[in-house]
Amino acid sequence: MEHGSYEHSCGCVPGKGTDGARKVIKRWVVNDPKGTSKVAVLDVKQCYPTLPHEQLRLKLEKRIKDRKFLRLAFKIIASYQQAMANKTQLLPETIAVGIPVGLYTSPWFLNFFFQDLDHLIAEKCGLSHLVRYVDDMVLFDNSKKRLHAAIRTVGDYLQHMQMRLKSTWQVYHLRIRPLDFLGFKFHANGKITLRKSILYRISRKARTIARKGYASVTNASGMISYKGYMDHSDSSGFYEKWVQPFINFKVLKGVVSNENRKQCKALCAA
């Protein structure tokens, strides 16, 4: 399903993900400041609940010829529709919509479904700087006119697929306002910071652990995840002031490691 996918489609793709999106955006902003001077941020409205089954099946049949794979994929697609979540009458598969959030195959189906859209933006709209994370898209260019044309193209494509673009899309100058994407803020000078809400949650969790004198598995694993955010952004000043005095990450890793060993022993005993 990855064959033919757009290079910078990063959501839930092994080796890419959030870190892959962060790296490529920073590289573009630093190496091509003119070509990334304007940015468009947009996403699909209720992407998972509105994905049309018939269109997804047609795309799979067109690209993949392995009948065994297709039979399995079609069974997975038909096993759920949004009417189940809404507790309403089930629809015929030809007009059914929706794939379940959290199912392993769902982000793969979404990434595959939007492959054509990725190439359409790059080829028809002439934009070379596009990152998509599942249903969230970021487009860069030096022309607001081209970005608005690309947004219209995306909207028309989604309408053809019986889906919709959220009305909250934005186009703006990167030097005036940083790009807020995936928890990071990308500045025109190449600097990467974290959202204030994330910084607040990090400092609050650090103080909570310090006040209690111990860390639960949940708090320990959460704090370790936040450490990854700080390591991949320009947050050294924040870390030194609000985290380092309160947290010993070796101890937190020990807490998580001990819990993993307990779970492994329990599984082996069963």
Task: Label every PLM stretch briefly.
Residues 11-22, 41:
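Long, hydrophobic, well-ordered secondary-structure blocks that form the structural core
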Residues 88-96, 148-155, 165-270:
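Right-hand nucleic-acid polymerase module
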Residues 10, 14, 97, 101, ...:
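Short glycine-rich loop/turn motifs that provide flexible caps or phosphate-binding loops at active sites
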